[in-house]
Amino acid sequence: QGVTERHGDEATFRPVPSAGARHAFETYLYCRRVEALEEGIYRYLPLEHRLLFEFTEPGLAARISEACFGQRFVGQGAVTFFWSVIPYRMEWRYGPAAHRVLPMDVGHVCQNLYLSAEAIGAGACAVAAYDQEALDALLHLDGEEEFVIYLAPVGKHAVSA
């Protein structure tokens, strides 16, 4: 979701479609096995195209898996991407229709992750089954103005026997 073009203070263009170029999502990452990065939660800063370390704590992988109803693979990948939504970024422009385009937009974002993962020989798995309150709390989101909408762990493909 890095910025590819800026139009003053009005809009940014990115390599993923967004209704009205509103880009209502934030990207958080749980980096577990990423070279040169401390294990923990990071936030992606699209204007600077960099990661901001947010926090770490013991047992993050287990807490993430638990918040995803025991899906262990979610917390065990090299990195897990979380997308949160800030609905107001879309609502001020589209009103009630915003809630119809947000799921499509986050799907576009996740599809780009699938394509990127495949390009480097890795795999991704979109996950929408999670405990909303637990995951919002884990990422320190308020659950109202900003909340998790989708996530996807990324890692090496399983080796076939």
State each model region's role:
Residues 56, 147-161:
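C-terminal helix-cap and adjacent tail motif
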Residues 1-76, 161:
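N-terminal amphipathic, basic helical "cap/leader" segment at the start of enzyme domains
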Residues 137-144:
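Short proline/glycine-enriched turn/loop segments at secondary-structure junctions
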Residues 41-43, 80-82, 151-153:
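Conserved hydrophobic/aromatic beta-strand scaffold that supports enzyme active sites
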Residues 27, 81-83, 87-90, 94, ...:
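Small-aliphatic-rich amphipathic alpha-helix that forms the alpha element of a beta-alpha
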Residues 32-34, 86, 157:
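Solvent-exposed coil/turn segments that connect beta secondary-structure elements
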Residues 118, 144-146:
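A structural signal for short secondary-structure junctions
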Residues 3-4, 117, 156:
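A generic secondary-structure signal for well-formed alpha-helical elements
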